[in-house]
Amino acid sequence: MSNTYAFGKTVATDVGQTIERVTQALAKEGFGILSDIDVAGTLKKKLGLDLPAYRILGACNPQFAHRALEAEPEIGTLLPCNVVVRKVGAGTRVDIMDPLAVMQLVGKPEVATIASEVRGRLQRVLGEI
């Protein structure tokens, strides 16, 4: 997947193992998981659809979130950083929201600086898995 709002990679581990690895790598960078949305499970329950595993993890680093909220109180509409973990073929795809791309919507240099720092941490997370 190539786009301007996320970066990611495909790994050989299953979805469960990948979520564990992602969660551990996020913790090393100061992030916790605020939400875990089972998209495939929800669509199965609500629409009767059988889809491959698809989870959205809402990751947050409290220090960066606090700085961003101080710079722009409405920025909460763009938080937390979403990490998608989904089944693809024989592997698992991990895509992470690019905070620099998304936070450019705010148009404040101090927010862009924070987003750049967060992006670096999230890129290290991707490198760990």
Label for each model-derived stretch:
Residues 23, 40-41, 123:
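Short glycine-/small-residue-rich flexible loop motifs, especially phosphate/cofactor-binding loops
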Residues 105-129:
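Well-ordered alpha/beta subsegment
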Residues 1-29:
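Terminal, regulation- and interaction-focused segments at domain boundaries
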Residues 81-107:
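Beta-strand/loop substructures that line and gate deep hydrophobic ligand-binding cavities in soluble
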Residues 3-5, 53, 79, 90:
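A generic structural signal for well-ordered coil/turn residues at beta-strand boundaries
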Residues 32-84:
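Compact, glycine-rich, soluble single-domain proteins
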Residues 13, 17, 38, 113, ...:
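Conserved active-site and cofactor/substrate-binding residues in soluble primary-metabolism enzymes
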Residues 28, 45-46, 128:
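Residues at alpha-helix termini
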